[in-house]
Structure formats: structure tokens, C-alpha cells
Amino acid sequence: MVYAEHGFEKKWYCVMRDPANVAEYSVYVCDFSKMDDGNRGVGKYSASGCTYMKDAKAFAVGNRSELLYYATTTEVKQCNFKDGGTSTLRYTLPTELIQAGYEISMLYLFKVSGKENEGKLLYIGVYNPTTEEGKLLECPIVETSGEILKDKVKTYDGFKKITHMAYKSK
């Protein structure tokens, strides 16, 4: 298993790699919300057509639809695992960040029940290993299609390497 996260309709989305063929990826969808009746597996989908998944540094799963994002060093892609296992480029780091040496270190899809932006914000952590500086990009998304609204991305500075995020209520 490469990655697993709770997502849409309370199902778990598990990215799996074939140990005998590292280019072969699958997405397993499981329903752990009920008693084990021997049929918790909801689906198995090929993700081998999702370009550069072998180079993924981070993943995020949606809770408003069946979204699966993965990030390489400078790009965020959406794996269309239910549509033949293809990928769609959703975001490329701005040229100035790439030229400065920043790389993607983390993805986090905001999934806090009852909050206004639930399922509508993708956070991207970026890190420059030379300067040891990190930034956080807040990216509004269309929660049903996965499109990232590039013209509305906000950048927050003043971090070190961001490896994980969580929401804390007051």
C-alpha cells in the first residue's frame, strides 16, 4: 500500500502498487463502515495510466466526490481512476517557486464536517531544501470535478517543511 485515506461516502481509498511491477498501480475502494461480511471491497480500479504516479510525493482524497490528487515535485495531478485510470494536470507550481528551488512536500484536502469550505480547499505544502523555508498554498477547488481555481490561490509564508496538516477547533 502506498497511501490510504477516508473519503467520499465514508469509504476508504487505497492506492496500491504491485511489488512485482512498480509501474502497476490500482485504487481499491473499501467500505469499513459496516460489519465485516466478507464484502467490504467496493471496487478495484487501474491507476496505471496516471502519469508519474511512481514519482508521487503526496496524495489527497476528496469527500464530496471521488477525487484523488497526487503530487510530483512540481505538479498536482488528478487520477481519474474510474475513467480508465488516466490523469489530469490540475496545478503546476508558479515558475518563480520552481526556479527558487521549491518542491511539493504535502497535500491536504480540507474535510471538516459542517465548515463552509468543507471539501473545497486543497492545501499544498512546498519546501525549499536549500533555504529550509516552507510555504503553504491554499487552492480553492471545484469539489465535484477536481478543477483547481488557479487565479484564487493564496500563499502563506513563514514555515519550515510542512509534512502534514490537521484542523483544530477552538
Predicted feature descriptions by range:
Residues 11, 20-31, 73-80, 130-140:
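Structural motif
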Residues 13-14, 70, 123-124:
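Residue position within the beta-strands of beta-propeller blades
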Residues 10, 66-68, 119-120:
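Structural hallmark of WD40 beta-propellers
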Residues 102-111, 118-148:
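C-terminal structured domain segments
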Residues 37-54, 87-97, 147-158:
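Beta-propeller fold detector
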Residues 132-170:
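Blade-level signature of beta-propeller repeat domains, shared across WD40, Kelch, NHL, RCC1
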Residues 1-9, 47-65, 98-114, 158-170:
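Repeated scaffold domains used in trafficking and secretory/extracellular systems
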Residues 32-36, 81-85, 140-144:
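Short loop/turn segments that connect beta-strands within beta-propeller blades
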